[in-house]
A protein has these predicted regions:
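DUTPase catalytic domain/fold
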Residues: 1-168
């Protein structure tokens, strides 16, 4: 029995499992003719670029539609981040909810909403339809179960919160 277990978890098994994680198929639907398949720009990129197919703006936000819906596998999550070029060209602009979370059971269009921190400000450069506006990072996550206890284990940090690791 131990021999079977060992064979199952040898290097070739681990390598095959890892390669399957590297080529995780993600189903997607183009919701309009201008939609662009999310893709990595370069080898080594963690996020796939999302391209704007629609745009609307109010006094407090600008919103881009990507024209795509995705089917993220169970036990995975899509995290949405702004491209650095957005924050470089429009200082102070950030994603409305900091990081977008796309759950595996969501099937609607991926929308990217940026907060405009200074109402009435005219930005010289903002992304337009056809520009890459965000990055989608898909990662696995554990399904956790909280267990109530009377006391947590002790650590060097203890209850030190904001900025506590800078103080010795």
């Amino acid at each position: 029995m131990a021999q079977t277990w060992h064979r199952r978890w040898d290097d070739s098994y681990a390598e095959a499992a890892f390669k399957n994680r590297l080529n995780l198929p993600i189903k997607y639907v183009k919701l309009n003719k201008d939609a662009v398949k999310p893709e990595y720009s370069q080898d080594g990129d963690a996020g796939m670029d999302l391209t704007a197919t629609s745009f609307r703006v109010t006094d407090t936000f600008m919103e881009y539609g990507t024209g795509i819906a995705v089917q993220i596998p169970e036990n995975h999550v899509g995290l949405l981040f702004p491209r650095s070029s957005i924050t470089k060209s429009a200082p102070g602009v950030s994603l409305k909810n900091s990081v977008g979370v796309i759950d595996s059971n969501y099937r609607g269009e991926i929308l990217v909403r940026f907060e405009l921190p200074y109402p009435g400000t005219v930005y010289r450069t903002i992304p337009i339809v056809g520009d890459r506006v965000a990055q989608l990072v898909i990662i696995p996550y554990p399904r956790v179960k909280f267990v109530e206890v009377d006391k947590l284990s002790d650590t060097n940090r203890g209850e030190g919160g904001f900025g506590s690791t800078d103080k010795q």
